[in-house]
Amino acid sequence: MALRGEGRKRKKGQERRQSSEDDVGNAATDYLVGQVADSLRGGARPPGGGTGRLAALFSTPETLAPPVFVPVPQETSKKRKPDDEEETVAHIKKPALQEPARKVKVKKLSDADKRLANRESALANADLEEIRQDQGQGRRRSQSRGKVTDGEALDVALSLNEDGRQRTKVPLNPEEERLKNERTVFVGNLPVTCNKKKLKSFFKEYGQVESVRFRSVMPAEGTLSKKLAAIKRKFHPDQKSINAYVVFKEERAAAKALQRNGAQIAEGFRIRVDLASETASRDKRSVFVGNLPYRVDESALEEHFLDCGSIVAVRIVRNPLTGVGRGFGYVLFENTDAVHLALKLNNSELMGRKLRVMRSVNKEKLKQQNSNPSVKKDGSKSKQRLNFTSKEGKSHSKNAFIGEKAVLMKKKKGQKKKGQTKKPRKQK
C-alpha cells in the first residue's frame, strides 16, 4: 500500500513538471506584441503599449449572429379610410366658405292672378295638343302615301330622300310613264317561292331586264308592309300565287317576252304574260264575273271558262290584308268571239254558287254615260225633235218668233175704252 502511494505521488509530480514545461515552451514560442521593442529599450515599455499576443492579430473574430430577414410591407392602391378622429380634425380645419342660402320669400298670389295663371296653362296645354294632333295626322298621311296599290304600280316611282332613309312617292312624267309601260310586261300566277333572280333568268333570253317588282302581296303579319313582306318573303299562309311587273331596257325585248305566255314556270303554275300598255283593248276582250265563292282560286275559274276560248289572264279581286276573295273577278280572252260564248255561261254554277257574267265596262266611260243622259248605252245619240212649220202654218217655234215693244200712248179725254158701254143715267 505504501508503494502504491509513493508511485501515485511520483506520477503527480511528473505531470506537474510536464505542465510547467509546456507553459514555458508556449511562452517562448508565442510572440508578444512589443517584445522586440522591450528588449531594445532595456525592458522599459511606454505607457499605453499593447500586451496582446501576435497570434491574436491573425485569429478570426467570433462569429456574429446571423441577420434576421424582415419582409417589406406591400403598398396597397386602396385608399385608407380616415379614422373618425381625422375626419373631425379635417372638418374643424376647413373654413366655412359657403354661406347658407337665404330663404326666398314667396309672394302670395291673389285670386285674380291664380285665375290668369290657370287660363295661361290651359291655353298652353291646348296648343300642345293641337301640335301633337297635327304630327299624328302627318304621320298617318306619310304612311298612307308610302303604301303602293296594284293600280298605282306603274304610276308612281319610289325615290330616296337626301338623307337616304325615308322613301317618298315622286310622280313620273306622263311621256316617260308611257314609254316605260311599252317596255313593261305583266306576269301573273307566279308561285310565292319565285324571286327576282329566278324571274330575271326566266326572261334573260329575250333581253336585259332593268327591274322586277312584285305585286298582289299579302303580308303574313298585319304590321308588315307589302314591300317588306316581298323582300323578307313572309307571305300569308293562304296565298298561293303573286303577280309581278318586269321592266326591260328595250321595247323589242318586252314584245319578245310575250312568247312566254302560258309557259309553266313551276308545277301547277302556268304564267300569264301581257304588255302593261295594252289596257284599252282589254275591256272588249274581258268579262266580269260576280257572285264568286270566296275561297275560289284562279285555276278553278280558268277551267270554268276554258271551253269558251283561249284565256289570256284571270284575275280575282282579293282583300289585301286577309287574301280572301271579294266575290268577283275578271277573265281576259284572246279575241272578242270568246266573250260572246262566255256571256252564255251567265247563271252557271261554280262550287255551288250561280255566277253573274257580263261584259267588262270601263269605269270612265260609264261615268261619262251617266253624266250625259242623251247618250244611249250603245253610244248613239237620241234624235232631237225640232218643230219646223210652213209660212202659212199658225204654229211657230219659240226661237222663230221675234216680237216688238209696244209704245205706250196717252189716253185722250173723249176716248172710250173698248168693251165699255154708256150706262143710262138714272132719272130723278
Curated annotation (Swiss-Prot):
Residue segments, region Disordered: 1-106, 127-152, 361-428
One GO term (biological process): maturation of LSU-rRNA from tricistronic rRNA transcript (SSU-rRNA, 5.8S rRNA, LSU-rRNA)
Domain RRM intervals: 183-278, 285-362
Species assigned in the record: Rattus norvegicus
Annotated positions of the Phosphoserine modification: S286
Name of the protein in its database record: RNA-binding protein 34
SMART domains the UniProt entry points to: RRM (SM00360)
Family to which this protein belongs: Belongs to the RRM RBM34 family.
Alphabetical keyword list: Acetylation, Isopeptide bond, Nucleus, Phosphoprotein, Repeat, RNA-binding, Ubl conjugation
Modified residues (N6-acetyllysine): K147
